[in-house]
Amino acid sequence: MSRSRSSAKAVQFKHESEEEEEDEEEQLPSRRMHSYGDAAAIGSGVPAFLAKLWRLVDDADTNRLICWTKDGQSFVIQNQAQFAKELLPLNYKHNNMASFIRQLNMYGFHKITSIDNGGLRFDRDEIEFSHPFFKRNSPFLLDQIKRKISNNKNGDDKGVLKPEAMSKILTDVKVMRGRQDNLDSRFSAMKQENEVLWREIASLRQKHAKQQQIVNKLIQFLITIVQPSRNMSGVKRHVQLMINNTPEIDRARTTSETESESGGGPVIHELREELLDEVMNPSPAGYTAASHYDQESVSPPAVERPRSNMSISSHNVDYSNQSVEDLLLQGNGTAGGNILVGGAASPMAQSVSQSPAQHDVYTVTEAPDSHVQEVPNSPPYYEEQNVLTTPMVREQEQQKRQQLKENNKLRRQAGDVILDAGDILVDSSSPKAQRTSIQHSTQPDVMVQPMIIKSEPENSSGLMDLMTPANDLYSVNFISEDMPTDIFEDALLPDGVEEAAKLDQQQKFGQSTVSSGKFASNFDVPTNSTLLDANQASTSKAAAKAQASEEEGMAVAKYSGAENGNNRDTNNSQLLRMASVDELHGHLESMQDELETLKDLLRGDGVAIDQNMLMGLFNDSDLMDNYGLSFPNDSISSEKKAPSGSELISYQPMYDLSDILDTDDGNNDQEASRRQMQTQSSVLNTPRHEL
């Protein structure tokens, strides 16, 4: 189909070209062609195609194939096939009907379609054409019919441009290029400026972040200096934590173990639960218990943190320094080897005596594992870490401490009056017992958990005979009356809190006494049948009066390093002595002066304070390490492993700047004077000693 169409088009183009050539050739003959009267009517400029068409339509002989319509405005070709076969070869040298119709369209003829003329009749082979200037009896109008110009010629005419237009276009292009170059340069400059601005913004942001960090650090530092309690950095905690295998607890825990393993000291065994029924109902001569507890006078429960190895003791058993002869009845003895003693919290401590030549007697009070239930009427207790530190709260705490000091002073005065009235002779006293006076009258009886004390005779050896009264550490005379009891205590703690905690423990857990031949080798049991009051023998002033006749030139003893003597092992500590107690007092005064100078320096302006540096100066491990004291059982206790989960240690936080920058100079003077008074009027506990 495509090939047939292409061939048909080629034939059509060939006929058209031939027709055009014929038209050009026949223009001149057609001008001279005149038939009868129509020759004068057709003009000289009429194309041959139009002249031939006019002759065919107007000829009556060809009406059967082509003729005018009734109105004479158009002509009709009735039989196209026969017309193409018979008439076209005679006039146009071809028999292609399509080429003839195309020529008519080129000269402006239009096909007329109507309802009557084949619009709805497909069986009729007729076709009608019309032109405004092709009419019957009007041949003179043929000159106005013009052939349409071909597309190729129009394209050639339009493709030719004038030089003026071309030059104008070139100038416009040059202007546009200049503008584009200008815009490109501006865009590049803007990009560079934008990059510079972004870099400056990044640098400024970094500087701003650094400045903000510096300001925040300065604000936090100032807040910690001015108000350290707000961020809980300066709060002292007195609550004990469960920590395993700490050096301080190992020392305190293994003290009794080393003494018992040495073979020369008493062995204390705690009863199990299945043996309590046998112990709760002993014979009257072997067991006596009395305990009084005043619920209304109970101070709030507080936990006393240990200060040194000398002050760390078991919280379940309280060992006092009070001598046995103050509490034993004269002439009252037992025949058994094991003595069961019930402790009492009242001042009238009851005990059972035995001949010191056969066995050692101890008065022991075992405290319960947990505190007694809090009395509903007792005042609430607030720890320092839960109390907001404000000037009003500080003032109230200062008032409470002053009131507590006055009460203690009144108790000491009352004890002195009783001692002066009764002429009681006291050999040794404990400062803990002075806080439990005048309370036994209203205290109800409380049964304390008993303990079995197994008394074993000491193994005498030749080394004991070499000791003289001057160098015997076991003798009572070794204790100096000028030695302070708080030499191993932490002086940085508030005195009011310390005294309240000790008083509370004395009221709850009672007074107990432990003495042995180690501490008093020879003593006489009093012959009086009455018991001595523990409070009367516990005041510091009474102890000072009773020991006024002792030697005043005693030196202060300290343990350090190792000793190469013959009487002790190489692992034991060396006994060093200071020249006099006055040197200790002078050292304390110099340290106090240095602290005052440091306070004045810190109060001055322009002093850069590093909080971490100041806190590092007050490391607990340095301050609380027994003040330079070491003991022979340290190496032994370090090798032993404590059972997991059975130790208690106090949590000691870093010291606060508020303790150093305290502006209350009057309170500091009072505390310094009180410490000096206690130093002069107190008696040091018997130092530990091991074989």
From Swiss-Prot:
PTM characteristics: Exhibits temperature-dependent phosphorylation.
Phosphothreonine PTM positions: T258
Pfam families in UniProt: HSF_DNA-bind (PF00447), Vert_HS_TF (PF06546)
Residue ranges for the DNA-binding region feature of this UniProt entry: 46-150
TM helices/strands, residue ranges: none
Gene Ontology cellular component terms for the protein in this record: chromatin; nucleus; polytene chromosome
Gene Ontology MF annotations: DNA binding; DNA-binding transcription factor activity; identical protein binding; sequence-specific DNA binding
SMART domains the record matches: HSF
Biased composition, class Polar residues, residue ranges: 675-685
Residue stretches of biased makeup (Acidic residues): 18-27, 659-668
Keywords: Activator, DNA-binding, Nucleus, Phosphoprotein, Stress response, Transcription, Transcription regulation
Location of the region described as Disordered in the Swiss-Prot/TrEMBL record: 1-31, 288-307, 658-691
Location relative to the cell: Nucleus
Family (UniProt): Belongs to the HSF family.
Function: DNA-binding protein that specifically binds heat shock promoter elements (HSE) and activates transcription. In higher eukaryotes, HSF is unable to bind to the HSE unless the cells are heat shocked.
Subunit structure: Homotrimer.
Name of this protein: Heat shock factor protein
Organism of origin: Drosophila melanogaster (Fruit fly)
Source species taxonomy: Eukaryota, Metazoa, Ecdysozoa, Arthropoda, Hexapoda
Gene name per UniProt: Hsf
